[in-house]
Every structure is written in structure tokens, then in C-alpha cells.
A protein has these predicted regions:
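Short hydrophobic/glycine-rich mini-motifs in sensory/regulatory modules
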Residues: 13-17, 128-131, 192, 206
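DG-centered beta-turn motif at the end of beta-strands
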Residues: 22-23, 93, 131-139, 193
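Acidic loop->beta-strand submotif enriched in PP2C/PPM serine/threonine phosphatases
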Residues: 1-13, 106-145
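Small-residue (GG/TT-enriched) beta-loop-alpha framework at ligand/catalytic clefts
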Residues: 75, 84, 95-126, 132, ...
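Active-site-proximal, acidic helix/loop segment immediately C-terminal to a metal-coordinating Asp/Glu
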Residues: 26-47, 132-182
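N-terminal glycine-rich anion-binding loops that anchor highly charged ligand groups
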Residues: 8-19, 26-32
Length: 219
């Protein structure tokens, strides 16, 4: 069955845009909703559109479910300017988790209603080493009705992320560790699509490569 979550990343010379979307329902319908949402938002934002235009476009574009009569996908946007400015926007999904020097941070957020949707936005300046971890609700549903009656709540996810942090841990390792725990809580049989995406703020590094003639004239 197709995954109902989708992550899209666009890299530009001066910024990186990450969008995680979770389509309503499951299978093909959810996949279509999540794919359209992530693609539309990332493409528009890479062209300097604001969140208002993105949400309005999604509302006019997403196919309406014939059963529920609505078109719906949650999303989390993380926009990283290469000067350190961060913009995030969240709609109806689990809130992202942020680490700074291994300590949990909660950036100040403001809510705006755009096209009938409550969008939570934040603006802040990142520091080297900051990590922003976003995830679909499959993470906080992990273990529900199995190892954990009420699922793995966000506070539990935050505690795990902080315990798992160590200096120089990569975004790839952090996301892999988080997904592995979810798989364990689901006992290898996920009850919901589970997706984790992380952004790790790192200073730009320069690599120099020296190339010379072969040691043997025959080469």
C-alpha cells in the first residue's frame, strides 16, 4: 500500500525548504493528497510565495474526497535561509521538536487563520548545531493499543530525542533512531504511516582536493 506521508526538499543557493505532508486517510488517496501538498508548497515557496498563497492554492487544488467531502492534508514547513533565519509553518500535525546544544527549545509561535485553516508560524535565528525534527502522527500513535495504551505522546518523543542526543549526531542518525523506536512500539506492524524528517544547522565547510600526475607513466 502506498504511503500517505510525503517529504519534499528543495535546495537553493541561499536557502533550503523542507515540507512534510500527511494526507487524509490511507493508501492512494492519502498519497495523492500528501504528494500534491508537499510539491505545491515547496515549489511555490521556492518561488518566493508566502504561506497565504500556498494555503489558498492547496485549498483550490486538492481533490475532494467523495466519501468525506473534504480535501485535507496536514503539513509542516521548515524554511532555512543560509544566513541562519528560520521560518516554520504547521497545520494540524504534531509540532516539530527543536534541540539546541542538546536542550529542548520551544520557539515562540503565532497562529493565523488562512482560508479557514489555523496555521502556526514561527520566526527565529538558528545557531550552529541546532536540529529541527518534524514527524507525522504515525510517530505519536506508535504503540497505541499494543505496548502503550494511549500511544507515544509528543512529550515522550521529546524525552527520547533529548536522551538520544549526543554531540555531532547527524540528522540521518537521529531520524533513523526515532523511526526504529516507532517500529519497535508497533511490534513491526505499523498501524499508521510513520515519517520523520530533520534539519541540522551546520556551518559551511570547505574541502580542498589536490590532484597530480599518476605515480607511474604507464597509468
Amino acid at each position: 500500500e502506498l504511503c500517505g506521508d510525503m517529504v519534499n526538499v528543495i535546495r537553493k543557493p541561499d536557502e533550503t525548504i523542507l515540507v512534510l505532508a500527511d494526507g487524509m486517510g490511507s493508501g492512494v488517496k492519502a498519497n495523492i493528497l500528501a504528494t500534491l501538498t508537499s510539491k505545491i508548497i515547496s515549489t511555490l515557496m521556492s518561488g518566493d510565495a508566502d504561506i497565504d498563497e500556498c494555503v489558498e492554492t492547496i485549498s483550490e487544488t486538492l481533490p475532494v474526497c467523495s466519501v468525506r467531502g473534504i480535501a485535507y492534508s496536514t503539513f509542516t514547513i521548515v524554511r532555512v535561509k543560509h544566513n541562519g533565519e528560520i521560518y516554520t509553518a504547521e497545520f494540524d500535525g504534531p509540532e516539530f521538536v527543536m534541540l539546541r546544544d542538546g536542550v529542548l527549545e520551544e520557539p515562540e509561535k503565532e497562529m493565523r487563520v488562512i482560508s479557514g485553516k489555523e496555521i502556526w508560524e514561527s520566526h527565529f535565528t538558528a545557531k550552529p548545531g541546532d536540529m529541527i525534527i518534524s514527524f507525522s502522527d504515525g510517530v505519536i500513535h506508535a504503540g497505541i493499543g499494543r505496548l502503550i495504551n494511549l500511544g507515544w505522546k509528543r512529550v515522550n518523543v521529546m524525552e527520547f530525542i533529548q536522551r538520544n542526543y549526543r554531540p555531532h549526531i547527524s540528522a540521518r542518525v537521529m531520524t533513523k533512531d526515532l523511526v526504529s523506536v516507532c517500529d519497535h512500539l508497533y511490534e513491526g506492524e505499523p498501524g499508521d504511516d510513520t515519517t520523520v524528517a530533520a534539519v541540522h544547522i551546520m556551518p559551511r565547510t570547505t574541502t580542498r582536493v589536490m590532484v597530480g600526475p599518476a605515480s607511474s607513466p604507464d597509468m
